């Protein structure tokens, strides 16, 4: 039975459109939101963890670069004039490692289009000059306990929302930041609009959740949804809008007439994306507790979100850094025909054997690491693969080495199998290129060592943070292991009783599961225990699995450590970001009472 539609509360509403989920997202988002969204603010998120390294390399080659150029050349060029005419203000972290360079490019575009804008720049996140002193003082990496590396490419503190709010208070039309937490571009808007104080922690948590929901673009409006076939019109999928109120409640929706799907399930999946312990979601401005968040229908493609709680933040910023750890090369070949998997496996092994001989003869050491994947044979499923003998396989071979020249020598061999070995070998696509292996490192830095600043025109001013408050423990939450009611049961795949969404943080993958009906939550908790998940995904997950509960949305969150082969650019896997982890787990068999399967809607 469908839940009744709950009317949204009345009062001032601030409408914020999430125009970009990453650097490389569609250029249609800002156009769609400005033309049909009726929004007050347009916010952009461009900075994945490793994007900063890419931007740092760009700035080393050309000092005027180092920011997300698409923000200026595509996004703003297509909407800036209309945004100014409609009074839409813009907040973006497109500044990367060169926020002032980005601001200069925006000003140049505004002049070209004949519009007047006040552009503010938030800086202070670059802590690379402090890394050596912190290393000497004994600071270590958060997860591994390793010392901070000697050579880093980038090191940036995740700033919060307060500098953005202060820039808007100063009447900026456009705010450009470097590294900040993704949700800060939304929370900063709400702190400015509603005058939320820096110690109004419940509202700060709610505003952060609103930002978290829209920070990945269409992932909140049906993108990556478990029930993908129910999501209409992918080609014109609607970008997300949050309609926010002073009390912290907000409605998630999308522009009218667009594709996509906004339901408690699609929004709930995004809540679970890339989070750890939902009672301790750490941000620079607030420690969020999302366990009791509730989501209710508020009309077609409208979901009302309430219930976020907050506590005082810590006195530290998280630093995200990247350092080079050798080089890698990855190439693909398509093998067609009889015994394709066996031919592909032998091709990969022969390439490695030949490569090692060539390295020895050229005076190079062996590869640091190698990985062969046979795409099309369910290689990601490990022991759970059930692919029928296939007659078409993509061989994906990745290797790493300490020296670029060694891999340049090896990469010349990737095309040779097309005439040397297996029949049906095709699809080489040219010689693969060698790229740096960038490892992520994270540590904490005292907030007192970092000074965020806002520059507006010729004026630069520091942003003073409120004095730290003692930490508070979250309210206790009754938990249980779940039960399996008496009576006959049936074995079904997990996807039959749950929605799923997975994400990454470094080498950790989280898998969020939402019961398809509240009555199924006890079954979900009973059947999906951490030790069972660790066993089922043991071919991928090398560390412990932790489970957390979010009863407000009838969900659990599984945090799998050492699950991504190093994660990001350090991983040799085809899925280094864990995008498929939830899909793998949703195939796990679970026992469900037959009575529930018969009584609940399909």
Question: What does each of the following model-derived ranges do?
Answer:
Residues 540-601:
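Helix-rich interaction surfaces within compact, conserved domain-sized segments
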Residues 307-491, 505, 510, 514, ...:
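C-terminal non-catalytic interaction/assembly regions of soluble proteins
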Residues 9-12, 49-65, 84, 127-151:
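Gly-rich Lys/Arg/Thr-decorated short loops/hinges at beta-loop-alpha junctions or inter-strand turns
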Residues 274, 278-301, 468-498:
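Short, Gly/Pro- and small/polar-rich lid/capping loops
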Residues 111-127, 187-232, 526:
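Catalytic or ion-translocation cores adjacent to nucleophile or general acid/base/metal-coordination motifs
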Residues 204-311, 328:
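A conserved active-site cap/scaffold subdomain adjacent to cofactor or substrate pockets
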């Amino acid at each position: 039975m469908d839940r009744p539609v709950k009317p949204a509360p009345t009062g001032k509403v601030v409408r914020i459109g999430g125009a970009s989920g990453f650097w490389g997202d569609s250029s249609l988002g800002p156009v769609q939101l400005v033309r049909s969204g009726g929004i007050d603010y347009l916010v952009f998120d461009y900075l994945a963890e490793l994007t900063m390294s890419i931007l740092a390399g760009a700035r080393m080659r050309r000092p005027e670069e180092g920011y997300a150029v698409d923000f200026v050349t595509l996004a703003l060029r297509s909407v800036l004039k209309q945004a100014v005419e409609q009074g839409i203000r813009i907040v973006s972290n497109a500044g990367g490692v060169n926020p002032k360079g980005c601001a200069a490019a925006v000003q140049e575009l505004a002049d070209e289009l004949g519009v007047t804008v006040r552009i503010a720049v938030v800086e202070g996140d670059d802590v690379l000059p402090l890394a050596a002193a912190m290393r000497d003082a004994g600071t270590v990496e958060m997860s591994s306990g390793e010392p901070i590396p000697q050579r880093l490419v980038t090191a940036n503190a995740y700033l919060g929302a307060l500098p953005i709010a202060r820039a808007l208070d100063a009447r900026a039309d456009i705010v450009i930041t470097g590294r900040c937490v993704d949700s800060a571009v939304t929370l900063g808007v709400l702190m400015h609009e509603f005058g939320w104080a820096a110690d109004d922690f419940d509202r700060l948590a709610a505003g952060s959740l609103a930002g978290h929901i829209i920070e990945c673009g269409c992932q909140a409006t049906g993108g990556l949804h478990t029930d993908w076939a129910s999501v209409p019109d992918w080609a014109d999928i609607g970008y997300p809008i949050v309609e926010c109120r002073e009390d912290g409640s907000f409605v998630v929706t999308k522009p009218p007439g667009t594709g996509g799907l906004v339901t408690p399930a699609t929004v709930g999946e995004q809540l679970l994306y890339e989070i750890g312990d939902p009672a301790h979601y750490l941000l620079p401005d607030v420690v969020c507790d999302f366990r009791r968040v509730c989501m209710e229908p508020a009309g077609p493609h409208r979901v009302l979100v309430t219930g976020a709680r907050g506590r005082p933040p810590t006195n530290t910023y998280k630093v995200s850094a990247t350092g080079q750890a050798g080089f890698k090369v990855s190439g693909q070949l398509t093998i067609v025909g009889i015994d394709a998997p066996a031919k592909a496996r032998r091709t990969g092994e022969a390439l490695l054997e030949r490569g090692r001989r060539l390295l020895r003869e050229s005076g190079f050491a062996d590869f640091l690491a190698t990985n062969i994947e046979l795409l099309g044979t369910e290689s990601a499923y490990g022991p759970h693969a059930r692919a029928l003998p296939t007659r078409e396989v993509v061989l994906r071979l990745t290797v790493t080495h300490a020296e670029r020249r060694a891999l340049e020598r090896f990469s010349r061999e990737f095309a040779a199998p097309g005439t040397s070995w297996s029949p049906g070998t095709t699809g080489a696509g040219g010689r693969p290129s060698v790229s740096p292996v960038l490892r992520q490192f994270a540590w904490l830095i005292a907030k007192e060592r970092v000074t965020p600043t806002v520059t507006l025109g010729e004026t630069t001013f520091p942003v003073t943070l409120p004095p730290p408050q003692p930490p508070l423990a979250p309210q206790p939450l009754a938990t249980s292991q779940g039960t399996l009611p008496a009576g006959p049961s049936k074995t079904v795949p997990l996807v039959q009783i749950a929605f799923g969404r997975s994400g990454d943080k470094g080498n950790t993958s989280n898998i969020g599961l939402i019961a398809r009906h509240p009555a199924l939550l006890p079954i979900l908790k009973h059947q999906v225990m951490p030790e069972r998940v660790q066993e089922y995904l043991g071919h991928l997950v090398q560390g412990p699995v932790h489970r957390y509960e979010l009863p407000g949305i009838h969900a659990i969150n599984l945090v799998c450590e050492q699950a991504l082969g190093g994660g990001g650019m350090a991983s040799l896997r085809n899925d280094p970001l864990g995008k498929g982890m939830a899909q793998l787990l949703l195939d796990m068999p679970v026992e469900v009472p037959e009575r529930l399967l018969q009584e609940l809607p399909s």
